[in-house]
Amino acid sequence: MSYDYNSSDPIKIKLADLEARERFLLSESKTFCMYPWIHLHAYPTGEAYPCCLAEMEHPIGNMRDNSLEEIWNGSNYVQMRERMLADKPCKECTRCYEQEAQGFFSMRNSHNKHFGHHIDKVDQGVNPDFKIVYWDIRFSNLCNLKCRSCGDIFSSNWVQENK
């Protein structure tokens, strides 16, 4: 799947057209996020997470040890999805929960808004078809930039500065 960079608006869905469970997950749940059903993020170290904001102490797997499919349907990711479906908080998602508690519109809120049209992919914790819609895999930290919003994990130019 590719991204349409000329797209101005996300695909819109009408909450009234959804089943009650889908409507609850997208608009009322305090823990549900679309990303664990459609996305995977991986650092240059191989550690995989549900998104770039996930707590680094809680990877869902490591791409050096497991295939993408093994991580996607592995126990850590499956348990995380099951917790979300049960409307229970996930340790990986603490940053979004904290932002929302402070009154901010979190990435979780944004993902549900912009990727809610994928709600039909949400069934149980396992996705046997292994269809990732969007991934963000950082293969190395080789970079000739030193952006202030970055660090040595993503940019080799920051390594000397951080020693």
Residue ranges and their predicted role:
Residues Q102-G103, S149, S156-N157:
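Short, non-ligating residues that shape and space the ligands of small metal-coordination modules
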Residues H117-V126:
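A Trp-anchored, charged/polar loop motif used as the substrate-binding/catalytic surface
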Residues S2-H117, K131-Y134:
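Accessory C-terminal segments flanking Radical SAM cores
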Residues N157-K163:
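A solvent-exposed, charged loop/short amphipathic helix patch at secondary-structure junctions
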Residues W37-G46, G125-F154:
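N-terminal pre-triad scaffold of radical SAM enzymes
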